[in-house]
Amino acid sequence: MNLEKLSKPELLTLFSILEGELEARDLVIEALKAQHRDTFIEERYGKYNISDPLMALQRDFETLKEKNDSEKQPVCTNPLSVLKAVMKQCKNMQERMLSQLAAAESRHRKVILDLEEERQRHAQDTAEGDDVTYMLEKERERLTQQLEFEKSQVKKFEKEQKKLSSQLEEERTRHKQLSSMLVLECRKATSKAAEEGQKAGELSLKLDKEKSRASKLEEELAAERKRGLQTEAQVEKQLSEFDIEREQLRAKLNREENRTRALKEEVESLKKLVKDLEAAQQHRSTSEQGREPVTMSRGTATEPPMRVSAFCQTESVQTERSHGSVITKLTDTGLPGPTTAAYSYAKANGHCDPEIQTTRELTSDSSTENQGPPREKSAVAAQEKPVENGGCPVGTETPVTMPSHLPSSGSSLSPSSTASSSLTSSPCSSPVLTKRLLGSAASSPGYQSSYQVGINQRFHAARHKFQSQADQDQQASGLQSPPSRDLSPTLLDNSAAKQLARNTVTQVLSRFTNQGPIKPVSPNSSPFGTDYRNLASTASPRGDTSHSPTPGKVSSPLSPLSPGIKSPTIPRAERGNPPPIPPKKPGLTPSQSATTPVTKTHSQASSLAATEDLASSCSPSAVVANGKDVEILLPTSS
């Protein structure tokens, strides 16, 4: 038994043996203790029967008496205890022998059973051995027959081999002849190959020379291609900038026309109001003729003009019109209303109500006729409503000065100077166009018309240049969203420079337009995206008139409820990372102008007329988006 590698049953047997040894040791210890106890008791109390209690009491009495008498008798051995020990030992030996006999009987039975099993196995093995010998005899007979058959086959194969060997000898002689012929042909082919190799070397030298020439030509072609791409990108960028500037100018002009139209309507309404006031004043004067006249002093004060920024892409009017209150005050007192009520006009998101300003002027004129008490005009009244995102013109005769802490002041309040003021205050207008437009205002309208003709020619040339490709894209798109249009008829490798220029234009446009969700548009789209002529004609007006001086404005293409402007760029999914936003031009920031009264002159009127001619090639669209007035410029086809 290997003690280092023990199996589970071996370990169990060892543990059982150890357990038996421990139990035997405990039994021996108990037996030894019992033997010593019995000997001690027998030696001391051997003459008494321990099972009888009376005898035990007598024994104890005698021991006590002996102690008292101090007389000790010698202890003698008792033969009864010895006999009991011998009997006990015999009983133990008998039990042990009986257990050994039972174990021997069980072992004998097991051996008998094993012998019987071995006898049966031997009988089976002998029977199987007879069967195996019979099968082996049959197999031997079969193999002998097969051996005879194979011998006959070997004889046949030997005969065939002799025939084949003779044939192989003949074939070998033929192959020798053929090999000699092939050697001769190979020598000839090697000589020809050497000649062809020399020719190939010469041709390779020529090919290398041609490749060097071709590489030089390719480098020159690549340089020319890069130059062409750069020039094309610059031209496209300039064209896009010119288009953007023209659209912005057209939007400003459209905004100013709407404002002048609103002012005219309000002037008519205020004329009616003045007539009513004059009638009320005449009635009051006739009633006061019988009274004693009172001399009243009249004080007037001049106010510097208000100069605010005239451009904001998103503008809304938040004005509380109090015509009824003004009329009641004027009819009750015979005097104009307080300056605070007349001057408190709202200015929010770059648009203010011109009706309140005109009402203020007319009520001031009526107060001078009625010899009312002097009232000083406070500059604080102009600060009652905050100015947000730039300013807009609100008055035509008496401009009011805005506080110096307002965001921007770059245009006068006269509508005759709206073109130049919108140019100077626009954050995206070109300084070159600004100088030209201001110069035309000082010189003559003919220069402005020639500039407009140049812009229109450039715009239509760029448009007709890409019309064919836009028509193909239109046929492919159908009623779905228009795909990305390549605005340059060049190869596909020019897409990098074109994409850079278009992304720059897109970044500029994204500053000044509200991007709405792009919806599928009609198939009759223009080369620059959606055909906005249909949108401008079919868009329904927004009913919110409290934010705009003209209630008839159409829905904005930039609003969330209408399709967005399709800029000449590729889709956002194909665009990749957007390019960095280019820095603003130094001439785009609005400049602070002097707060001096500006009157309407002939040169400014001519510049306004020229600006109207300039924007004649684009369709305006004044929109209302999210409660804010937005006026955008839409390209039209000529």
Swiss-Prot record:
One of its GO terms (cellular component) is stress fiber. The keyword Phosphoprotein applies. This is CTTNBP2 N-terminal-like protein. One of its GO terms (molecular function) is protein phosphatase 2A binding. It holds the Pfam family CortBP2. InterPro entries: Cortactin-Actin_Reg, Cortactin-binding_p2_N. Residues 87-284 form a coiled coil. Residues 401-430, 467-477 have a biased composition (Low complexity). It comes from the Eukaryota. It is found in: Cell projection, Lamellipodium; Cytoplasm, Cytoskeleton, Stress fiber. Regulates lamellipodial actin dynamics in a CTTN-dependent manner. Associates with core striatin-interacting phosphatase and kinase (STRIPAK) complex to form CTTNBP2NL-STRIPAK complexes. STRIPAK complexes have critical roles in protein (de)phosphorylation and are regulators of multiple signaling pathways including Hippo, MAPK, nuclear receptor and cytoskeleton remodeling. Different types of STRIPAK complexes are involved in a variety of biological processes such as cell growth, differentiation, apoptosis, metabolism and immune regulation. Predominantly expressed in skin, also detectable in spleen and lung (at protein level). Very low levels, if any, in brain (at protein level).
